[in-house]
Amino acid sequence: MFAKLESLERKYEDLERQLSAPDVVSDQERFRKLSKTHSDLSDVVAAFREYKKIAQDLEDNQEMAQDPDPEIRELAQAETKALKEAQVELEARLKVLLLPKDPMDEKNILLEIRAGTGGDEAALFAGDLFRMYTRYAETKRWKVEIMSQSETGSGGFKEVIASISGDKVYSRLKYESGAHRVQRVPATESQGRIHTSAVTVAIMPEAEEVDVAIDPNELRIDVYRSSGPGGQSVNTTDSAVRVTHIPSGLVVICQDEKSQHKNKAKALKVLRSRLLQVEQDKQRAEQEAARRSQVGTGDRSERIRTYNFPQGRVTDHRINLTLYRLDAVLEGDLDELCGALIGHYQAEALKAQADAA
């Protein structure tokens, strides 16, 4: 591990020299790429330099520990204990920083929320989840843009698709995909019985044209008049667009914009991300099948999280984490949940790395 860290530090220092060279500064594209690599290495290099400083301080403390003055020896022992604890924490952090990076982590995302079982109550909860993610995005200064929505008369969503753009959006939200279950008493329930409903969430890295090439000959594009809740027409022109990707059968409908051109652009953006997700899911399924053949399966991904309103709790079933602050979570306070999930999957990756060694 330390040989790799030394190599990364040398690379970091070389990048610093290159970034100050006039020929690099004058080449914007090259400067941008080198700056990105330099930025990517900054955390691990800073942690490694701190680790080396602690190692040097420990070495210096050995001399103090031999001092004839008992007070100085006692002080050295206390400092050594604190330094060793910091060294252990830093070593663990360095192992995480050296894990292979998910190439999608830097990407923006498409968020898809669909009401599942539970009728109107599921649609209302789909709206609650969309507001939750929107508020979380606001705290991170991310930009949210609705791509497509299908509202219900009760104020919920049958489906809503939005793009979220900003700093490392996918890395924070990628573990939100799955079935979210809600348990609460509907406003229309006269007996006070708790109903259980489900909503599915999909987090897809936003694909760019370089990620997924779409052959125009493989698309069928239909245009028609937009319609709102209940089927009423909201537009007198054929501005709604339905794009069908013939080889995969994927269909995307966009009708939120008054312009047919804008709806088509949004639909293609969603389609591109869905095709990228299909390819990623295929690769993950192949990897998971290989893993299951060796270690068996314990799949609990169907229901990833439960939101229980009577108890005011949120439980993430993948990591057995329960928080008794449902209101704060639904207001967009997701950092503890997201952080715990990221930590869990980093630990899983470290274990897999150790098992393979």
UniProtKB/Swiss-Prot annotation:
Gene3D superfamilies associated with the record: 3.30.160.20, 3.30.70.1660, 6.10.140.1950
Bias (Basic and acidic residues): 282-291
Domain of life (superkingdom): Bacteria
Xref: SUPFAM superfamilies: Release factor
N5-methylglutamine sites (modified residues): Q232
Pfam families: PCRF, RF-1
GO molecular-function terms, A-Z: translation release factor activity, codon specific
Compartmental location: Cytoplasm
Family label: Belongs to the prokaryotic/mitochondrial release factor family.
Name this polypeptide is given: Peptide chain release factor 1
